[in-house]
Amino acid sequence: EIMPSLVGSEMCIRDRTDHHEVPMKDGEELLPSADVIVDPKQSVDNYPYPQLCGAGIAYKLIYELYHRAGKKGCDRELLPFAAMATVCDVVPLYGENRSIVRRGLAGIHQTGNIGLNALIKHLDFHKEIRAMDLGFRIGPCINAPGRLRDATESLELFMETDAECAAQRAARIVETNEERKERTRSMTKQAAEEVQKQPLPPVLVVYLQECHESVAGIVAGNLREQFYRPVYVITDSGDHLKGSGRSIPGYHMQQELQACQKYLTEFGGHAAAAGFSLRREQLEGLKSALLAHCSLTQGQLIEKVTYDREVALAEMDTTLVTQLSCCLLYTSPSPRD
């Protein structure tokens, strides 16, 4: 009912397009004040597929506006960007998400976006681009300027109309990503050394004063891989603190923060990851509360490798490899260094 009234109108839409869980307080959803809230995870929404990432929801919204305006096909240029966001946000790759990624990958080499073409060329892909490439190579480059300087650098790349200027912008963005990776390695090493000074608790809460807040989530993910614990990395941000968390199965990060929300000024996230802000004087209280509320067992702190069946070496032929390659998009590549 809403869409027809928006087409051709001057109405301002302030939307909440994200895949994070809706925060709760006293049994009520905490929703922003907005003209329109676009969030399939809110209780009043009956959209059948709630696993879309923020960019996926934005793409669906634009698609519907184009469709109702009679501009069919105009959305195709946006599919590679929706695919990149879907992979980099590590949402489940089934249903609509799988369709978005599959169609985005199919069209990425034919994109008319000069900036995206320049970035692909600079990264020197020798084979067709896969979902893993979106998560491990293209996505981190796009995110790097926003982590270290200004996210508009990536936006300007994709809005560039001159091929030579686009090539220069792409080179700078790739260089920025290399700088970001070096900072991440340094901070991960420093954090790991700090963690190893004492017996491992079930939840790691690490304060890194010198860590840039934009790489805190990557550092948390690296520590999670190294120690197999839920990890919160907290950094300075002006006169307060900001944190980013990465989790393991069995520990719902958003719910754990919700249980400790009296120590926080803001928080949001989902089972696997979260972000939050707090006042400096609340740091020790938050640490204690997170540890006290954690119910992980020792068994849950041991990483498990699951598989469907054992495969004999004689079964591994090119036919099987080709068949398995069809299942690639059902995995969720986790962007990292």
Tell where the protein language model's regions lie, with residue ranges:
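Single conserved hydrophobic/aromatic residue that forms the stacking wall/gate
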Residues: 1-8, 13, 330-337
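A contiguous loop/helix-start segment that scaffolds small-molecule binding in enzyme catalytic cores
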Residues: 90, 110-114, 293-332, 336
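N-terminal small/polar loop signature for handling phosphorylated ligands or for N-terminal nucleophile
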Residues: 9-10, 14-30, 38, 224
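Generic detector of well-ordered alpha-helical packing
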Residues: 19-20, 40, 90, 144, ...
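Hydrophobic helix-and-loop "lid/oligomerization" segment in the mid-to-C-terminal part
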Residues: 33, 67-284, 288
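Alpha-helix capping and helix-loop boundary segments enriched in small/acidic/polar residues
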Residues: 9, 23, 45-53, 91-92, ...
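Short, ordered loop/turn segments at secondary-structure junctions
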Residues: 19-22, 41-43, 209-210, 236-239
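Short alpha-helices
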Residues: 29-71, 75-87
